[in-house]
Design a protein with these regions (language model features):
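"A position-specific structural signal for the A-helix of alpha-solenoid helical repeats
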Residues: 21, 54, 88, 95, ...
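Residue at a conserved register position within TPR or TPR-like alpha-solenoid repeats
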Residues: 26, 59, 93, 100, ...
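Structural motif corresponding to the intra-repeat A-B loop/turn of tetratricopeptide repeats
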Residues: 29, 62, 96, 140, ...
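Structural marker of alpha-solenoid helical repeat scaffolds
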Residues: 44-45, 78-79, 122, 158-161, ...
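Residue signature of alpha-solenoid helical repeat architecture, marking inter-repeat boundaries
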Residues: 46, 80, 87, 107, ...
Length: 289
């Protein structure tokens, strides 16, 4: 009897592992509806943390904010010391706030702020949580808790975790604070780190490296690789529209005087966003090659 049960239980584990593999393949292929269907079936018999987390991620990719929030909240309650769950809960709540009315957004401010703060407290090296707090304090009006001073503080914390992230963060805050010369100085400092960049864990950093490479015409080949990585790994959580990445990649190819590839990517940018003025200007520059 024990042998029969063992084989039966092993079969369940295999099915679960196979389903997880299929889900990962669908997610990598950006076939989120197929991933969702598999996970909804799997969660009926296997409501594990892994399945819930993956389903919450898929809901967020599909912009099903309420469904994602429900699952992330369950995970936060079940694992209150998991920094990533707090961050994701705050991040998805922020996306819901951005997609609705200002009145609804005001009611979510506390949840967003507290989730990011909790994540940063639980993990002193949590890069995404600090970026979330920087965005939060720069986006929210002062009367509702916005604070440039606090944004600078978290940018400084990022600098102690990762110098290149810190310089990008400080540049971002300076731009929002109208300190463009100081922002430029921070962007220039990021260039010192680019030649030694190996694996990039945070996809938004791929975009920033590609952007600064194009803006200052430095390390263009690396910039192209990183921007392609950003596009390949892109999800809605990355924040920057794909049209912007296509435009940046076209600009990088123009700097290499590669008209063929520049045209491919600038056309993708304009097809993705027809009124993209910067991309239209870039296409005119490409035509002069």
């Amino acid at each position: 009897m024990k042998i029969v049960l063992l084989f039966w239980f092993s079969g369940l584990l295999f099915l679960s592992a196979q389903t997880t593999t299929n889900v990962d393949n669908y997610i990598n292929a950006k076939e989120y509806k197929k991933a969702k269907a598999l996970l909804l079936k799997e969660i009926q018999s296997n409501p594990s943390t892994t399945v819930k987390s993956k389903l919450a991620d898929v809901y967020s990719y599909l912009k099903e904010w309420d469904n994602a929030i429900t699952l992330y909240k369950e995970l936060v309650v079940a694992y209150p010391k998991n920094a990533d769950y707090h961050f994701k809960y705050g991040g998805i709540t922020a996306r819901k706030a951005q997609s609705g009315s200002r009145i609804r957004a005001l009611g979510l401010i506390g949840t967003i702020r507290n989730s990011f703060i909790k994540a940063s407290e639980l993990d002193p090296k949590h890069v995404n949580a600090r970026w979330g707090l920087i965005d939060f304090y720069l986006s929210v009006p002062i009367i509702f808790g916005g604070s440039t001073t606090k944004a600078y503080r978290y940018a400084d914390e990022l600098a102690s975790i990762s110098p290149i992230e810190g310089h990008f963060a400080l540049a971002y805050v300076y731009v929002n604070d109208g300190e463009l010369e100081k922002a430029t100085m921070q962007y220039l400092k990021t260039l010192d780190y680019i030649p030694n960049i190996k694996k990039v864990e945070r996809n938004q950093l791929n975009y920033l490296i590609g952007k600064v490479s194009g803006d200052y015409n430095q390390y263009v080949d690396i910039g192209i690789l990183k921007m392609k990585d950003f596009i390949k790994n892109y999800t809605i959580k990355d924040g920057v529209p794909l049209s912007e990445a296509y435009y940046r990649l076209a600009k990088l190819y123009r700097l290499k005087k590669d008209r063929t590839n520049a045209n491919i990517w600038i056309n993708k940018a304009i097809a993705n966003q027809t009124n993209f003025k910067q991309a239209i200007v870039e296409r005119e520059l490409i035509e002069t090659l």
